[in-house]
Each structure stands twice: as structure tokens, then as C-alpha cells.
């Protein structure tokens, strides 16, 4: 568990208590009595990726005779918008083209998504951080990361447009320089 967050649990509890008071609620009433503790515990889980390095997920690396696209698509994730501290959630699609047959376990791609999504985050940064981790750890010929997400800050407040999705993409290496490769990966992502 993230030591920094764990050591600040009491501080989080106090802040939630004060927030409830500032909202005009009675933090000592039965329904709210344990809320500060529950919220602090929830934040431990939701922000567990703060002190983790997504590159550490790529410890299992194998040499295989595979030089074509590796894609893990439709990876569900949840994160917290750093602007409003409300969730955004969606699907991540992570593709790479191995260099010299250097591949990783498929679950490692999902684990990297998990680590960077468990932070106060922006979708744009989330996309870049996944691509960076994959690129630095495996040194592939190309990387393409695409994320589609619904942001509760657009659904529950402000413009109130439920169901609207934000799509971000990072394309590197041969996936960027070779239009045909890029289009093939995007077609694979959209293929059911």
C-alpha cells in the first residue's frame, strides 16, 4: 500500500470532516459518523498509483519471434479528474510493435494502465504516461495508446452531457511514421 497516503490517512479524515461541516452537515450524525474514515480508505485505494512507476509493471519480458502488432484493447479503468476530484472512466487500448521480438506479458499492459489511472489525473497525461512507460521499458518499434472516457465533471455538473466521451491518443515510432500501420491498429481497436 502507498506509504505516503497511508501516513496521511488521519489528515484526509480531518479534511473530510471539515468538508462535511462546511457543507452544513453534521459529521457526527449516524449516517456520516464513519464517512471520513471510509473516504480516507477509498482514497488509499483510488490513489494507490501515486508512488508507483508504471515501468515496473514490465518486469516480465520475453524474446519471441513476433514482430507484428500486439494490442490489448478495451481495458476498463477508473481515475479521478484532478480538476474536480470526480471520477472519469472508460476504456484504454494499448498497442505496440515489438523490436527484436521483445514482448511482455499481456496483463502487464493492463497493469500499467491501472497504475497511472490510480492518481489524480488528466486523460491527456494518462495517455502519455502509458505510452512513455511502454516505450521506455520495451523500446518497441512503435506504440499507439488510445483512451475513450466519460468524465463525471461533464456528466454531473457544468455542461451536464451524460454519455459524451473524450478520446485521446498518443502515437510513436513506426505507428506514427507509417500511416498504414497506424490505420491498421485503429481498425483493430474498432473491430468487434
UniProtKB/Swiss-Prot annotation:
Entry binding sites for Zn(2+): 81, 84, 153
A Pfam family matched in the record: GTP_cyclohydroI
EC number: 3.5.4.16
Species, as recorded: Streptococcus mutans serotype c (strain ATCC 700610 / UA159)
The name this protein goes by in its record: GTP cyclohydrolase 1
Assembly with partners or alone: Toroid-shaped homodecamer, composed of two pentamers of five dimers.
GO cellular component: cytoplasm
HAMAP family per UniProt: FolE (MF_00223)
Family recorded in the similarity comment: Belongs to the GTP cyclohydrolase I family.
InterPro entries in the record: GTP-CH-I_C/QueF, GTP-CH-I_N, GTP_CycHdrlase_I, GTP_CycHdrlase_I_CS, GTP_CycHdrlase_I_dom
One annotated GO molecular function: zinc ion binding
Catalysed reaction equations from the record: GTP + H2O = 7,8-dihydroneopterin 3'-triphosphate + formate + H(+)
Keywords for the protein's UniProt record, in alphabetical order: GTP-binding, Hydrolase, Metal-binding, Nucleotide-binding, One-carbon metabolism, Zinc
Pathways per UniProt: Cofactor biosynthesis; 7,8-dihydroneopterin triphosphate biosynthesis; 7,8-dihydroneopterin triphosphate from GTP: step 1/1
Gene Ontology biological process terms in this record: one-carbon metabolic process; tetrahydrobiopterin biosynthetic process; tetrahydrofolate biosynthetic process
Amino acid at each position: 500500500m502507498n506509504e505516503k497516503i497511508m501516513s496521511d490517512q488521519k489528515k484526509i479524515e480531518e479534511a473530510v470532516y471539515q468538508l462535511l461541516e462546511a457543507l452544513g452537515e453534521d459529521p457526527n450524525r449516524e449516517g456520516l459518523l464513519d464517512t471520513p474514515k471510509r473516504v480516507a480508505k477509498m482514497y488509499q485505494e483510488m490513489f494507490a498509483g501515486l508512488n508507483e512507476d508504471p515501468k515496473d509493471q514490465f518486469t516480465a519480458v520475453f524474446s519471441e519471434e513476433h514482430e507484428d502488432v500486439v494490442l490489448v484493447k478495451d481495458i476498463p479503468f477508473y481515475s479521478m479528474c484532478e480538476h474536480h476530484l470526480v471520477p472519469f472512466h472508460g476504456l484504454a487500448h494499448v498497442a505496440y510493435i515489438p523490436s527484436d521480438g521483445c514482448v511482455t506479458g499481456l496483463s502487464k499492459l493492463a497493469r500499467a494502465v491501472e497504475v497511472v489511472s490510480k492518481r489524480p489525473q488528466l486523460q491527456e497525461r494518462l495517455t502519455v504516461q502509458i505510452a512513455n512507460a511502454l516505450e521506455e521499458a520495451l523500446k518497441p518499434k512503435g506504440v499507439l495508446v488510445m483512451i475513450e472516457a466519460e468524465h463525471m465533471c461533464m456528466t454531473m455538473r457544468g455542461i451536464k452531457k451524460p454519455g459524451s466521451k473524450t478520446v485521446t491518443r498518443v502515437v510513436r515510432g513506426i505507428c506514427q511514421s507509417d500511416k498504414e500501420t497506424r490505420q491498421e491498429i485503429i481498425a483493430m481497436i474498432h473491430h468487434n
